[in-house]
């Protein structure tokens, strides 16, 4: 049976390659990279960037039964995702995507359509309008509580990655459900951890390359289905509670806003109706996209500062100059980041060197298009190599070096693409940037980051086939610099 399946798969692959070669014989396609085992590379984004030396910034890879176009420069990514955004706004409907999202109701993984646009508008409005006034004070409050917990562990090694993860999960829980109760936060945190671990396993990722394998026994697939059932059970419970208690015309959190907004008439006609399933998947996207991503970036920032204590000292001097020595009662000037230019530059440099999603989720062309003069047929899968674009030595001087000062000269360095760009830009970017700014400012103002006994944390990403650019576990010792600044409630 297995041999027959492999023979059939080989025959189908050969037939498809011949068909595509005939179908696109008159087109000027990007060059094709030799080989077909590209995904086995331990540091895939860097490997893909290396191929540009021979093939240029746009080329094709053969993955399974299809060719995939890779964009490796800021210029090509912005040309596709901003100037030709409609052409490249689609999302391929791969087996793993269909598995982890309710049918065609997911925002991050859903294909481009009028209904998708309405779904995006509702979620964006919930983030920017529904909770606009509560976002900043909430992040301040939870960060202050985080610093108090860290002060209680001062002088002992702390697994800072886990602490950041609970902090960011608490923020999302409060904004989404209006609740930071420990039981709920722990339930969602464990759910997200389990789900991402299951989804990123090679036994799931390979199904997108060789879909035929889904018909064979797969323990990893069963674990993922169990994680999805747990996820949906938790979200559905919260949706029921909100529907039973919300008041029309008022909203306590994002879930209230989206549940009430999904039934409102839309300006666009013919796109269908937003359903509760769309709200369900928006909640899922907020937790998946807003918990581990921000926590990982914060962890990378701490690791880089442990390697560069001179940058940490300059940051603390900047904070002391703006907020007072040690820890004072002043609030971080969130509405004017220019008052803390080195902190802003340091965040930008961390995002440049370690974009948490180094290879953006695949796009799909909605119609025939072109990039740098190459034809890109309709239905082509396109992958932006964000980390590759950030390490392009034709754009960045000494691209592999940690140099926040490169962002201190206005116009000297381009804006990083860590959150994507165009129609598929991360909707949570404003919240993520707010968290990065507040947490690092509060943390560095209150503590000096010191490495515990032993080697410094590794700056090499963990090698795996997942989506996020994760790092090796490490610990940090927090040395208090003075009394922690009072919380927002004391500044009335």
Curated annotation (Swiss-Prot):
GO cellular component: endoplasmic reticulum membrane
Subcellular location: Endoplasmic reticulum membrane; Microsome membrane
One annotated GO molecular function: heme binding
Domain of life: Eukaryota
Residues annotated to bind progesterone: 231
Membrane topology: Peripheral membrane protein
Positions with a binding annotation for 17alpha-hydroxyprogesterone: 231
Reported cofactor(s): heme b
Keywords: Endoplasmic reticulum, Heme, Iron, Lipid-binding, Membrane, Metal-binding, Microsome, Monooxygenase, Oxidoreductase, Steroid-binding, Steroidogenesis
Keyword check for Ribonucleoprotein: no
Catalytic activity: 17alpha-hydroxyprogesterone + reduced [NADPH--hemoprotein reductase] + O2 = 11-deoxycortisol + oxidized [NADPH--hemoprotein reductase] + H2O + H(+); progesterone + reduced [NADPH--hemoprotein reductase] + O2 = 21-hydroxyprogesterone + oxidized [NADPH--hemoprotein reductase] + H2O + H(+)
Residues noted as binding heme b in the record, renumbered to the chain: 91, 120, 363, 424, 426
InterPro entries attached to this UniProt entry: Cyt_P450, Cyt_P450_CS, Cyt_P450_E_grp-I, Cyt_P450_sf
UniProt entry tagged with the keyword Iron: yes
Annotated EC: 1.14.14.16
Main localization, broad class: endoplasmic reticulum
GO BP: any one term: steroid biosynthetic process
Similarity annotation: Belongs to the cytochrome P450 family.
Alphabetical list of PANTHER family matching this protein: STEROID 17-ALPHA-HYDROXYLASE/17,20 LYASE (PTHR24289), STEROID 21-HYDROXYLASE ISOFORM X1 (PTHR24289:SF17)
Domain notes: The leucine-rich hydrophobic amino acid N-terminal region probably helps to anchor the protein to the microsomal membrane.
Record's function text: Specifically catalyzes the 21-hydroxylation of steroids. Required for the adrenal synthesis of mineralocorticoids and glucocorticoids.
UniProt protein name: Steroid 21-hydroxylase
Taxonomy of the source species: Eukaryota, Metazoa, Chordata, Craniata, Vertebrata
């Amino acid at each position: 049976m297995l041999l027959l399946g492999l023979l059939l798969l080989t025959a189908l692959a050969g037939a498809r390659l011949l068909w595509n070669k005939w179908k696109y014989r008159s087109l000027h396609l990007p060059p094709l990279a030799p080989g077909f085992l590209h995904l086995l590379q331990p540091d895939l984004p860097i490997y893909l960037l290396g191929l540009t030396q021979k093939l240029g910034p746009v080329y094709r890879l053969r993955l399974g039964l299809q060719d995939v176009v890779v964009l490796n420069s800021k210029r090509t990514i912005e040309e596709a995702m901003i100037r030709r955004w409609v052409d490249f706004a689609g999302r391929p409907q791969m087996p793993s995507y269909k598995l982890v999202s309710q049918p065609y109701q997911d925002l991050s993984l859903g294909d481009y359509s009028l209904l998708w646009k309405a779904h995006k508008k509702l979620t964006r409005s919930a983030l920017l309008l529904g909770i606009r006034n509560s976002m900043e004070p909430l992040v301040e409050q939870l960060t202050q509580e985080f610093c108090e917990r860290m002060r209680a562990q001062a002088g002992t090694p702390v697994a800072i990655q886990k602490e950041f993860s609970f902090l960011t999960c608490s923020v999302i829980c409060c904004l989404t459900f209006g609740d930071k109760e420990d039981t709920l936060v722990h339930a969602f945190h464990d759910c997200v951890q389990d789900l991402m671990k299951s989804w990123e396993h090679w036994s799931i990722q390979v199904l997108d390359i060789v879909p035929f394998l889904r018909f064979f026994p797969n323990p990893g697939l069963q674990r993922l289905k169990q994680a999805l059932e747990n996820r949906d059970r938790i979200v559905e419970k919260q949706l029921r509670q909100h529907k039973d208690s919300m008041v029309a015309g008022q909203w306590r959190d994002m879930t209230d806003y989206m549940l009430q907004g999904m039934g409102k008439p839309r300006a666009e006609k013919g796109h269908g109706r937003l359903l509760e399933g769309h709200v369900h998947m928006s909640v899922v996207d907020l937790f998946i996209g807003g918990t581990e991503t921000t926590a990982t970036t914060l962890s990378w920032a701490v690791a880089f500062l442990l390697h560069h204590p001179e940058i940490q000292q300059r940051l603390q001097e900047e904070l002391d100059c703006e907020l007072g020595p040690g820890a004072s009662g002043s609030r971080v000037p969130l509405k004017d980041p220019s008052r803390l230019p080195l902190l802003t530059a340091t965040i930008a440099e961390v995002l440049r060197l370690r974009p948490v999603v180094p290879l953006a989720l695949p796009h799909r062309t909605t119609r025939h298009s072109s990039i740098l003069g190459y034809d890109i047929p309709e239905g082509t899968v396109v992958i932006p190599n964000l980390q590759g674009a950030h390490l392009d030595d034709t754009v960045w001087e000494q691209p592999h070096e940690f140099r926040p000062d490169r962002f201190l000269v206005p116009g000297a360095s381009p804006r990083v693409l860590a959150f994507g760009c165009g129609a598929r830009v991360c909707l949570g970017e404003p919240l993520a940037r707010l968290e990065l700014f507040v947490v690092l400012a509060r943390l560095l103002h209150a503590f000096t980051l010191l490495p515990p006994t032993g080697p410094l944390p590794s700056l090499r990403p963990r090698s795996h086939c997942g989506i996020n650019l994760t790092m090796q576990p490490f610990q940090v010792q927090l040395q208090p610099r003075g009394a922690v600044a009072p919380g927002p409630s004391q500044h009335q």
